Design a protein with these regions (language model features):
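Gly/Pro/Ser/Thr-rich low-complexity, intrinsically disordered segments predominantly at protein N-termini
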Residues: 1-177
Length: 177
């Protein structure tokens, strides 16, 4: 009888041991390597960082916006580490020198061709169970934004030419230019 093969369970220490320049995320003890983002991806990250940051500054808000690479430790068991494209954190006690301990309030992921299932399925489930309040999946190929508001248990889709209301702020919406 063949013995059952156990898959290795990795921790944050394995992520820290990666060679310089190599980026990966850790979800439930499994390492997912990340390819370098393309120009369109980086432009979208910059756009969202600027729009959200400007809004927070205008409102003298307490939240902070962090673009990738920024470490998010979703729980304390050291088997979940992600680098969302955009993280908005409203609880200053979650922010440390190493990143964010616990769920950000709002996460935006920009879909790349090689990571669609990560953003649409794996991270969707992980972010919901970790306590993220709002999760946007921005798909440049489809020119669509899928918005999950976990507290209200809603999902809505918007095209890039529509204003997308931000659930964690009552008076803020974003239209992708």
């Amino acid at each position: 009888m063949d013995a059952l093969r156990k898959e290795a369970v990795y921790t944050i220490e394995d992520i820290y041991a990666l060679p310089d320049g190599e980026r990966a995320e850790l979800i439930d003890g499994k390492i997912y390597y990340m390819a370098p983002p393309n120009t369109k991806h980086q432009r979208l990250v910059h756009f969202f960082d600027r729009e959200i940051g400007n809004y927070i500054q205008r409102k003298n808000g307490k939240c902070e916006v962090f673009p990738a690479p920024f470490a998010v430790f979703l729980n304390e068991n050291h088997t979940n580490y992600v680098e969302p494209d955009i993280s908005v954190i409203c609880d200053p006690d979650k922010i440390t020198d190493k990143g964010c301990n616990g769920a950000p309030d709002w996460i935006i992921e920009i879909v790349a061709s090689g990571n669609k299932s990560m953003d649409y399925f794996t991270k969707l489930f992980k972010y919901r169970t970790a306590g993220v309040r709002e999760y946007w999946i921005v798909d440049p190929a489809k020119k669509m934004i899928t918005v999950y508001r976990f507290e209200k248990e809603t999902m809505e889709e918007y095209s890039f030419d529509e204003k997308v209301p931000v659930g964690i702020y009552e008076d803020f919406s974003i239209k992708v230019q």
